[in-house]
Amino acid sequence: MKEPSIVVKGARAHNLKDIDIELPKNKLIVMTGLSGSGKSSLAFDTIYAEGQRRYVESLSAYARQFLGQMDKPDVDTIEGLSPAISIDQKTTSKNPRSTVATVTEIYDYIRLLYARVGKPYCPNHNIEIESQTVQQMVDRIMELEARTKIQLLAPVIAHRKGSHEKLIEDIGKKGYVRLRIDGEIVDVNDVPTLDKNKNHTIEVVVDRLVVKDGIETRLADSIETALELSEGQLTVDVIDGEDLKFSESHACPICGFSIGELEPRMFSFNSPFGACPTCDGLGQKLTVDVDLVVPDKDKTLNEGAIEPWIPTSSDFYPTLLKRVCEVYKINMDKPFKKLTERQRDILLYGSGDKEIEFTFTQRQGGTRKRTMVFEGVVPNISRRFHESPSEYTREMMSKYMTELPCETCHGKRLSREALSVYVGGLNIGEVVEYSISQALNYYKNIDLSEQDQAIANQILKEIISRLTFLNNVGLEYLTLNRASGTLSGGEAQRIRLATQIGSRLTGVLYVLDEPSIGLHQRDNDRLINTLKEMRDLGNTLIVVEHDDDTMRAADYLVDIGPGAGEHGGQIVSSGTPQKVMKDKKSLTGQYLSGKKRIEVPEYRRPASDRKISIRGARSNNLKGVDVDIPLSIMTVVTGVSGSGKSSLVNEVLYKSLAQKINKSKVKPGLYDKIEGIDQLDKIIDIDQSPIGRTPRSNPATYTGVFDDIRDVFAQTNEAKIRGYQKGRFSFNVKGGRCEACKGDGIIKIEMHFLPDVYVPCEVCDGKRYNRETLEVTYKGKNIADILEMTVEEATQFFENIPKIKRKLQTLVDVGLGYVTLGQQATTLSGGEAQRVKLASELHKRSTGKSIYILDEPTTGLHVDDISRLLKVLNRLVENGDTVVIIEHNLDVIKTADYIIDLGPEGGSGGGTIVATGTPEDIAQTKSSYTGKYLKEVLERDKQNTEDK
């Protein structure tokens, strides 16, 4: 019987050239090929898109409007499709409330565990809270000052949606006269209609009393009635005082600290019942940072030391500052750091109640006199941020503010009550500070009583199962409270991968995009085993991947190429990895079999005396690291995932240099000192973020070559005759562009129930320019024709104009010859965007004082692309510049001049320097995981060289 398969016929999405392919079902399929060859076009834009579209099509029109409909991919037929799930890197939640624990649903089970077997303790006296008797409640109320007026309330509805009409009617029938609804006392017969879509709290007024001797019996009776009405809860409304809360279940006998019935929502920082009231469950507060307000303390007040008050169109703040200095005799020509502590305090935090009179010039002209108390710069920024109706003002003020842990909950996000409940000796805030491996160990060995163990058994099973999956995909170093927005693309993808395994679905088509990103070689085997486990459940996995180990582990390997862009889009080879390795046409096969490889350099640049010295780096998990980064060579920072590479390079090195050199507002991670910054004059972070967020941005505009091309067109005879300047050939401004589409070339048509449709502009036929502009030509081509050329074509076309050719040649050198000059920035992959940035740096004149920082530049790159990338990076170093790379890819690591290896483990087990030196030095370091794998690669390459 024929094995089931997915049959694709006539796929033409993007650069795919009408390809037909049959893929075996229930197998691990890896698609590979050069960057831009068409892998994602086949995997995501064809197979996944059609699988998803067919599923959505089966839903009702009502449901479809919420899901949004996917376009039908450009393909003739696809047979044998299963429901498709895509696990890519782009869908990480940036919501500050989203954490590793919430995304994986582990937190839901932990909350349930605390609600079922948690033991509440009084935070003031550290004793377990037992249930309160009516007598204890009476005694506590009688301690109130004599003649205090009180109302006994029975909470019958606690923060629940609904209009609650029936309940209110029943309360009236029982003879109760008053209610407190959402804090307001109302007559039971005059209750306004409640909005059923809002949460409400309803309390019955059971009795109203004045505290005095002799009311104990009546008080006890009323308390019993209230407890019966509200299932054991009682609120005492102390007139002109704070409410007292009592519970038949939980309260401290010494201080009366009481806690309501334990329920899961009490432990949720996304619920008003559990969230810290100060920070609303965010764990952080935006606070004015003095270091951002006065970034350069060597400046004087006259030189603009207080940055937010540097003069603008109104001189209100500079005049106020001048007057304050006159009143308090503060020298405005003295460096800020040399002012006395008292003087700095007055400037930053205000002058108390003393009023100051001054006259300032208004924005519209004219002068005005004001008398006011000087509040201080810090309170002024805070007030304007919180109270200003202007979005612009709030944005400007936020530049001088930093997220700091909330003072009430100390960053734990939860209320005092929630943090007073313990299981196994820890509260929920302490548990989520554990890394995944620590939490797994804790829950496997948790010590519970026999009764609690019976209750918690099923919950613990779910928690341990999910933690095990996360551990198995190499994420053991992540803490449970880590914010989702701070995860790398690879980490976020592996979290979703672990969640999917936990769901135990079968018969599904999973499409994954480079799950090995950010993963050290040590953890690769665990990831591959996870993928195989998903396959063995009866699922089909299509993985777009360049990783050597993953390709070798595939059941079926598809090599797409042979080149990129126009030169790709074909199936070069497919079959088992062994079959592809034997195929001489397959570039991937040649690299896999060792016939082609990236060579180890014959000569490594020695580390010179010129260096950046970092001392006492303590950002995140770094343990007071001291390290030297040599200048004018290529340094690669390595280490297992979570070892502290990004903390050292991005948080400490980049941010501190950006702050000093670029005068950036970023706040670096903690460190004692950094020396050697004066040897640099430029720091550039070349990441994989888009080169522009609108279709108007493209490689030509980003690299600046489009300016030169517009100059050429403005110099043509036709342009001179017509009086056209350079601006005429811009599609961003009026004049030369087509006004029907405002220079976009496309028009958006909104469709209800269907996705928005983009159609070429009928007026300019998608050319972006008006007819008159397009009549100007250079060598027979108009400006729109130039934008449609590939970089390779344009390089030949402008070969006689050195300025343009030089810039275009750098794009060819980084492997982007296939991209069109006018390709929209939004359609470039992360790897392509990064290489456009590299190209724009390459054609600039080097000073030899620049430092380039790259975080995993091999993401999305084939081995052949990596080879090209390394040549480009070496060109930067040959100019005398410095390159610092965070990388796991052994081909990059083996070509480095110098390596800084962090570890030894991830998370709390990392954050120290394991070894530094040349790749050969690291390979000899027994304690280095990187060294172990590097040694194998260096020996294999040496063997291959000798065999030749």
UniProtKB/Swiss-Prot annotation:
<dbReference type="Pfam" id="PF17755">
    <property type="entry name" value="UvrA_DNA-bind"/>
</dbReference>
<dbReference type="Pfam" id="PF17760">
    <property type="entry name" value="UvrA_inter"/>
</dbReference>
<feature type="domain" description="ABC transporter 2">
    <location>
        <begin position="607"/>
        <end position="935"/>
    </location>
</feature>
<feature type="zinc finger region" description="C4-type">
    <location>
        <begin position="252"/>
        <end position="279"/>
    </location>
</feature>
<keyword id="KW-0238">DNA-binding</keyword>
<protein>
    <recommendedName>
        <fullName>UvrABC system protein A</fullName>
    </recommendedName>
</protein>
<dbReference type="GO" id="GO:0006289">
    <property type="term" value="P:nucleotide-excision repair"/>
</dbReference>
<dbReference type="GO" id="GO:0005524">
    <property type="term" value="F:ATP binding"/>
</dbReference>
<comment type="similarity">
    <text>Belongs to the ABC transporter superfamily. UvrA family.</text>
</comment>
<feature type="binding site">
    <location>
        <begin position="639"/>
        <end position="646"/>
    </location>
    <ligand>
        <name>ATP</name>
    </ligand>
</feature>
<dbReference type="InterPro" id="IPR027417">
    <property type="entry name" value="P-loop_NTPase"/>
</dbReference>
<comment type="function">
    <text>The UvrABC repair system catalyzes the recognition and processing of DNA lesions. UvrA is an ATPase and a DNA-binding protein. A damage recognition complex composed of 2 UvrA and 2 UvrB subunits scans DNA for abnormalities. When the presence of a lesion has been verified by UvrB, the UvrA molecules dissociate.</text>
</comment>
<feature type="binding site">
    <location>
        <begin position="33"/>
        <end position="40"/>
    </location>
    <ligand>
        <name>ATP</name>
    </ligand>
</feature>
<dbReference type="GO" id="GO:0009380">
    <property type="term" value="C:excinuclease repair complex"/>
</dbReference>
<dbReference type="GO" id="GO:0008270">
    <property type="term" value="F:zinc ion binding"/>
</dbReference>
<dbReference type="InterPro" id="IPR041552">
    <property type="entry name" value="UvrA_DNA-bd"/>
</dbReference>
<keyword id="KW-0863">Zinc-finger</keyword>
<dbReference type="GO" id="GO:0016887">
    <property type="term" value="F:ATP hydrolysis activity"/>
</dbReference>
<keyword id="KW-0267">Excision nuclease</keyword>
<dbReference type="InterPro" id="IPR003439">
    <property type="entry name" value="ABC_transporter-like_ATP-bd"/>
</dbReference>
<keyword id="KW-0677">Repeat</keyword>
<dbReference type="GO" id="GO:0009432">
    <property type="term" value="P:SOS response"/>
</dbReference>
<dbReference type="InterPro" id="IPR017871">
    <property type="entry name" value="ABC_transporter-like_CS"/>
</dbReference>
<keyword id="KW-0862">Zinc</keyword>
<dbReference type="InterPro" id="IPR041102">
    <property type="entry name" value="UvrA_inter"/>
</dbReference>
<keyword id="KW-0963">Cytoplasm</keyword>
<feature type="domain" description="ABC transporter 1">
    <location>
        <begin position="309"/>
        <end position="587"/>
    </location>
</feature>
<dbReference type="InterPro" id="IPR004602">
    <property type="entry name" value="UvrA"/>
</dbReference>
<keyword id="KW-0742">SOS response</keyword>
<dbReference type="GO" id="GO:0003677">
    <property type="term" value="F:DNA binding"/>
</dbReference>
<keyword id="KW-0479">Metal-binding</keyword>
<keyword id="KW-0547">Nucleotide-binding</keyword>
<dbReference type="GO" id="GO:0005737">
    <property type="term" value="C:cytoplasm"/>
</dbReference>
<dbReference type="GO" id="GO:0009381">
    <property type="term" value="F:excinuclease ABC activity"/>
</dbReference>
<keyword id="KW-0234">DNA repair</keyword>
<keyword id="KW-0227">DNA damage</keyword>
<keyword id="KW-0228">DNA excision</keyword>
<keyword id="KW-0067">ATP-binding</keyword>
<comment type="subunit">
    <text>Forms a heterotetramer with UvrB during the search for lesions.</text>
</comment>
<dbReference type="InterPro" id="IPR013815">
    <property type="entry name" value="ATP_grasp_subdomain_1"/>
</dbReference>
<feature type="zinc finger region" description="C4-type">
    <location>
        <begin position="738"/>
        <end position="764"/>
    </location>
</feature>
